[in-house]
Amino acid sequence: MNIIEQLEQEEIARLGKTVPDFAPGDTVVVQVKVKEGNRERLQAYEGVVIAKRNRGLNSAFTVRKISAGEGVERTFQTYSPLVASVEVKRRGDVRRAKLYYLRERSGKSARIKEKLPARKASVAAE
């Protein structure tokens, strides 16, 4: 590990931010800090993760949602101070790392199958 990576790891540890494990296809709710005038509030942004960029301190993810019939995408820096929290609502079962093909789709074709938890072997044997 070179010195830059080491400094980034130290900075991530110093921030102490716990980010849940999520992957493209998952539906997440991102709580974003929004400043309006002199007051600050949290705004929820719920959508499907279509891309994830793992680069240590520079990690980012893109969330897509449909707002008033229009597709809206927003990219968040994972360790940004503006991102208060990330909550996984639903796990999606996809076979791609980047889901950019969802941009051209609408309606039922844009749906993502839900990933169901694996059944135990004892249940399958019965």
Swiss-Prot record:
Keywords: Ribonucleoprotein, Ribosomal protein. GO terms for biological process: translation. InterPro entries: Ribosomal_bL19, Ribosomal_bL19_CS, Ribosomal_bL19_sf, Translation_prot_SH3-like_sf. One of its GO terms (cellular component) is cytosolic large ribosomal subunit. Pfam families: Ribosomal_L19. It comes from the Bacteria. The keyword Ribonucleoprotein applies. GO terms for molecular function: structural constituent of ribosome. The keyword Oxidoreductase does not apply. This protein is located at the 30S-50S ribosomal subunit interface and may play a role in the structure and function of the aminoacyl-tRNA binding site. PANTHER family: LARGE RIBOSOMAL SUBUNIT PROTEIN BL19M, RIBOSOMAL PROTEIN L19. Belongs to the bacterial ribosomal protein bL19 family. This is Large ribosomal subunit protein bL19. It comes from Thiobacillus denitrificans (strain ATCC 25259 / T1).
